[in-house]
Amino acid sequence: MGLAPLAFAGHAIYTQTNAGAGNQILVFTDGPGSPLQWRESVPTLGIGTDSGLGSQSALVLSTHGQWLLAVNAGSNDISTFHVDRHGHLTLTSRTPSGGTEPISLTQHEDLVYVLNAGGNGNITGFRLGDDGSLDPIPGSTRDLGGNAVGPAQVGFDRSGDTLVVTEKAASRIALYAVDEDGVPSAPHLAVSVGQTPFGFTFDRHDNLLVSEAFGGAPGASAVSSYELEDQGLETESASVPTHQSAACWVVATRRGAFAYATDTGSGTVTGYRVARDGDLRALTADGISGITGPGSAPTDAALGGDELYVLAAN
């Protein structure tokens, strides 16, 4: 079973199996001072790929926590669940993704975009209905920056005016301007400061924080920060080292003062202090803010209140 991403709502934590025999959402609960407890598994009615997706945000909660959206990379569709006030899930729709091998999702208000990695890859947009339906937006499908670019994540900035896609194999970041109808422009391509840009997040000041895996080279990973500009990206902090290996997933606290990257190749988590202007400073000299254990390969992460949840296979 290939556990994929994490999402957090109230005291419920979600991940998915990405199983080829049938993808499922695994639901856990927590409480003050208590360990995570397994609650239930909920079928998506789609299928996975039985392997790692190599992406961030394959499972996302809507802004107000009412909807949970999951990719089914093996059946090329998206499952949408209603989330009740206790964190229980009810499947409301399955929708073709507009491509093959969907691996990442993003939501802003009623807009949802999916990143399809199969073939040459694309992004495709939908309107999220009050009933949980996803209606394709005409003319919203856009190509990526080229062929075999190794996409990792799609995400909106805080305003919803720009879509961002990281391209691992090309070491580029693609930017799409989104018009008032929710339709993106052709991609504007920016060269990543560091190699193998992977996961990213926007902090509360709309600084773009991007993890850089540097091809998994030992001790070479980093995180960079950027400011979005009309003509592309302005670098704020360039490749601030984790001193760890394969930094792939990155999350920022709600107030934006801290960010954390999971170092899959090292079994560690690296923390950063984030200034309003995007300046990044590692919290420790060795880049180790947390240890998930030898061979644990931490992948995705989610923040809930003062808790950092890290998905690590043992």
PLM region spans:
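Short loop/turn segments immediately following the C-termini of beta-strands
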Residues: 18-20, 30, 73, 83, ...
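Structural motif
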Residues: 22-26, 77-79, 122-124, 172-175, ...
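A short beta-strand motif characteristic of beta-propeller blades
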Residues: 38-50, 90-96, 137-145, 185-191, ...
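Beta-rich, blade/repeat-based domains predominating
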Residues: 45-64, 97-111, 143-162, 192-210, ...
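Aromatic- and glycine-enriched pocket-lining scaffold segments that form the walls
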Residues: 113-128, 135-199
